[in-house]
Amino acid sequence: MLITQILATFVDLNYKSTTMELPFAESWKIKMVEPIRKSTREEREQWIKEAHYNVFQLKSEQVYIDLITDSGTGAMSDRQWAGMMLGDESYAGATSFFKLKEVITRLTGFEYIIPTHQGRAAENVLFSYLVHEGDIVPGNSHFDTTKGHIEGRRALALDCTIDEAKQTQLEIPFKGNVDPKKLEKALQEHSERIPFVIVTITNNTAGGQPVSMQNLREVRAIADKYGKPVLFDSARFAENAYFIKMREEGYRNKSI
């Protein structure tokens, strides 16, 4: 009797699924979980006091909801876990490197690739060559490590993000954009001190907000006018491309 009821329910649900639109569902299943626990107010007060009110000194297990960054917070797929077993960790000539280089070159056209373990390591390598004392580096809300690597070389990180990015109640499609007027002003006044323009996509410090394709073209045009290269901190370039596809006119039918 129970089996009959289950089958009838399944058939009914299957029929309904063909006659009405089902609610949105993610296209993956979760295979692994990590335990977390809620803390008490007394515990949190004690922990933050012991950390001298510096949230960077808190232990990760003391934080129930971590909003400090979206880096390293996503689960890996079963294909990624399986790929770790196939990875070649040879000291030189690793096949893993050539696979990575092939994909990056195909996507970007760049021939020379230097893999790093983290974005801040890439910044250190690049800025050691490009940034010097007294330089000014304009961009859209430099990430904290980006700003640190610039200021650590006695240079200035100049924020040229649009003012709307600071209005938390304002909803616009591309709050991570560079303000063209601010960028133009910086280049007019300090061109000789500016080695490059950096654009972070998505704009992490401004809440992970995207940058429009139109804005990227405007930045490129202004930089070209003054003969300056444009660098991307492109940690979330795929997400930014998705937002362009969804929100910017003319890109709905473009692939990511």
Residue ranges and their predicted role:
Residues 21-75, 80, 89-113, 117-256:
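Conserved PLP-enzyme active-site core in the AAT-like
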Residues 83-84:
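Positively charged, low-complexity intrinsically disordered leader regions
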Residues 2-6:
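Extreme N-terminal basic, low-complexity initiation segments
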Residues 9-16:
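Short, positively charged and aromatic/hydrophobic N-terminal segments
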